[in-house]
Amino acid sequence: MSPDIRDLTTADDASLLALNNVEVPRVTALDEAALKRYRPVLRDALAVGAEGDPDGFCWTVGPGTDYWSANYAWTSRHYSRFVYLDRVVVAPRARGRGVARALYDAVSARAVGT
């Protein structure tokens, strides 16, 4: 059975920051200010697990956004239609349970027709 996907909420912020920052340098470090700056430009911000204590999360950005990423900028220069998956992070306690697969599948399903 695939884990349930839900939208990230502000109740997830503290856990999201902790999960994210354990994975630096594989992902860019985040603090509250960066999260506040990113949130308005995200296309999708998804989570698996309890609100306030997610097992994993991901976020995507669409075209035409002022997003602070060299990889996103490259994608924007080369493609007009895309969904840029910026990060997928899974808590160590949840690895091997299909969390990342469920997040990738949800992003793919939402991107169809984009």
How should each PLM-predicted stretch be described?
Residues 90, 96-109:
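Conserved acetyl-CoA-binding loop-helix of GNAT-fold acetyltransferases
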Residues 111-114:
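Conserved GNAT acetyl-CoA-binding A-motif
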Residues 59-87:
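Conserved acyl-donor/pantetheine-binding loop and adjacent beta-alpha core of acyl/acetyltransferases
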Residues 36-42:
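Short loop/turn motifs at secondary-structure junctions and domain boundaries
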Residues 1-34, 47-55:
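Short amphipathic alpha-helix that is part of the acyltransferase structural core
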Residues 25, 94-95:
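Residues in soluble alpha-helical coiled-coils and helical-bundle/repeat scaffolds
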